[in-house]
Each structure stands twice: as structure tokens, then as C-alpha cells.
């Protein structure tokens, strides 16, 4: 299915740390998102503030076939990519992440497992590679893959505004630096 899940014992992973805590901070963290609107790039590198922003907003999409009644893609924001399971204010976890990124020199990437047909633009403030092994370069600038660039602009503006509205409504303790790392519509409505 489009929204399949699997679970298995941690002991099945050869290099798993069974004590529940690693000895060091990871070198790389990957956030997965599914942009059903097709405007986020397939891969982008996040600086500390952008990583905190995307962690605290937890954007993904609901698509037809994954939930009853969903006919069109719908944005969904679940702070920390698992909001119901996090009892503290998202900023607490966001700051913890920021501290770990700084102290460990961790690189953070946002991987879009959703649709292509749209890509990076100034609204989303994401660093997108110009080349990636085994990935056609035209996919990295997916705005050019849309048949209608004006439609891309319309959809991108709408999604950027959804990010802003979500942060203003639900993430009131987000620092100005982290908020500034998030998307912004280019046009004033």
C-alpha cells in the first residue's frame, strides 16, 4: 500500500545498540516527508535552524487511499514527526535537536518521498544539490518538470502559506531564528 508499515525485533538489526542509547551523536540525520503537492525538492540539506523548523513542523501529506474520505492530497503537520507521543512543547525537543546537531557536527537532510513535478524555490529556503549520483539533474529542479510553471507557483505559494499558518497557530514558542528558517510565500495576498 502507499502507507505501509512494518515492525520487527530490534535484535534483527546486526549493528543495533540494544542498550537503547548510542555512544555518539549520529553523523547524519534524515527526515522523511511525503509532499503530495509536488513542490518540495527530492533532497535538501538543512542547516541547524532549518532542521529544527522542519522537525518541529513535521510536514507530510495524506493521500487518497491511505485514509477513509481522503480524495485529494491534504497537508498534515505533526510536530516532531510524532506529535501524539511527545508530551513536552515542541520547542523543547527542537532545542535538544539543535544542541545535538551543533555538538556532533551532524548533517541533516530532508528527503521528499512524495511526488515529483515540483521543486525548490525561494519560498522554501532549502539547499538543493545541483547534481546527485544516479539522479537525473532535471529532477532536482522539479519546477522545470511541471508542465505549467504558473500552476507550480500557485501550488507552492499555497503550501508555503500552510507552513506559516501552522507555525503561527501551533508553534508559538518557536524562536525567531528557527521561524525565519521556514517557508514564506513570495507574494503578499
Region spans (language model):
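Conserved NTP phosphate-binding and transfer environment spanning the P-loop NTPase/kinase superfamily
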Residues: 2-189
Amino acid at each position: 500500500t502507499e502507507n505501509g508499515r512494518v515492525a520487527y525485533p530490534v535484535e534483527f538489526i546486526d549493528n543495533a545498540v540494544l542498550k537503547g542509547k548510542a555512544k555518539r551523536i549520529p553523523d547524519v540525520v534524515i527526515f522523511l516527508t511525503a509532499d503530495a503537492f509536488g513542490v518540495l525538492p527530492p533532497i535538501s540539506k538543512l542547516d541547524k535552524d532549518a532542521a529544527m523548523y522542519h522537525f518541529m513542523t513535521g510536514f507530510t501529506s495524506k493521500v487518497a487511499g491511505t485514509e477513509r474520505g481522503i480524495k485529494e492530497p491534504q497537508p498534515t503537520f505533526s510536530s516532531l514527526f510524532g506529535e501524539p507521543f511527545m508530551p513536552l512543547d515542541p520547542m523543547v525537543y527542537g532545542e535538544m535537536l539543535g544542541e545535538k546537531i551543533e555538538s556532533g557536527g551532524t548533517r541533516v537532510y530532508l528527503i521528499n518521498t512524495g511526488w515529483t513535478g515540483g521543486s525548490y524555490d525561494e519560498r522554501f529556503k532549502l539547499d538543493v544539490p545541483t547534481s546527485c549520483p544516479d539522479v537525473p539533474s532535471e529532477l532536482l529542479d522539479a519546477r522545470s518538470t511541471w508542465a505549467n510553471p504558473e500552476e507550480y507557483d500557485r501550488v507552492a505559494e499555497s503550501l508555503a502559506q500552510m507552513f506559516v499558518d501552522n507555525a503561527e497557530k501551533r508553534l508559538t514558542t518557536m524562536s525567531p531564528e528557527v521561524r525565519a528558517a521556514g517557508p514564506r510565500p513570495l507574494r503578499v495576498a
